[in-house]
A protein has these predicted regions:
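Two-component system phosphorelay core
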Residues: 1-113
Length: 113
């Protein structure tokens, strides 16, 4: 039933992930998220090339940076990426990469004063 499907898409996305961030960070958040998108692309190409060391370093940086900006989920994923890279666990790396991609595509910033 296509009308039900169309109706589903018109609803405000229940699949969005709201993240509450202090409004004083509003100027730097778009850049932070753009950098994570770039990390995503870098990690994908590093996985293809087997460059786990770069993934480990990016994961470590995400782990350190995420929480400071209010993105605890990015810190968690960064930690998972770092550990999986150190363990040479490619299937886990693919899973965590998917998790990061999913989070970035669904995150919705809610600025709080």
């Amino acid at each position: 039933d296509t009308s039900a499907m169309m109706h589903h898409h018109a609803e405000p996305g229940p699949d969005k992930i709201p993240v509450h961030i202090d409004s004083s960070l509003e100027a730097i958040i778009p850049g932070f998220l753009a950098n994570r998108q770039r990390d995503l692309t870098t990690i994908e190409s590093c996985l293809k090339q087997g460059d786990l060391n770069t993934i480990r370093m990016l994961g470590h940086r995400m782990k350190g940076d995420g929480g400071g900006y209010g993105f605890d989920q990015i810190s968690v994923i960064g930690d998972q990426l770092e550990r999986a890279a150190m363990a040479h666990n490619l299937s886990a790396l693919h899973d965590h990469l998917k998790g990061l991609k999913d989070f970035l595509s669904r995150v919705e910033i809610v600025y709080v004063h």
